[in-house]
């Protein structure tokens, strides 16, 4: 049975169901059980915040302090502890408040979690799922608005998931927690209130499999995270001019679904990739490189990548709106790819 649930609620429900299914699932993070009424934390007050955005609200009272653990303000500390937990049989789900703080925890990911399985000949696993939020659009300024999934996705041994819908948020998180590899799960904070149909039951979505959200024949647009909604707006606009757009939500950036993207490009012969990360050494350029090498003969025009500028995220609302990829920018690129396009870009 499905019902409307917002993105945040879908994540909360996934965590709850994962903890019910497996007693080895442990949550760690800053203020994820407390935050408010810290002096009576042992009572797990129902009014506790549940993290900076309230995503884990209610899980402390239900599952207890030994499984929903408030940590000191030390990403290095609790991420290191999580690697140790995972190496010894638990399935920790640490919450890194903002992905901009990942530098404090980088050794745990780059030096430890990503390499242990390889270094022990496949006999050791680190089933850790790191939850973190990302994304511009909330006027949260340069230190709380980055999208660094491409940086983490470049590390061998780590899977990276970036859901765009409430349905995917739940299914991909449950799949991540079940996975015996380390997964970094990126949540766009501007999507937390977005509602969608979400099944009540436990379900998983395959990691590494993209979703063809809209089928088309003239142009492929590949998206990451909330850029899906920019692409859908563009597709609706172009449809009025007789242009058929296929929209692919990547869902996972490490590994990303080469097969689905390549098959689409072979059909439409044109590709635009929208990625809100900065423009160099990112997922969009990786996709462009692979498609250029493996499907060059199918292309009727140059691959276009539309990203944020090569600067930190501005604080001002007006500047931030210009900073992010938007429908107008995509339509401009599409107009150059399709000769008979009759859209005023």
Regions found by a protein language model. Give the residues of each.
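Thiamine diphosphate
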Residues: 1-182, 189-190, 194-345
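Non-catalytic, usually N-terminal nucleic-acid engagement modules in DNA/RNA processing proteins
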Residues: 185
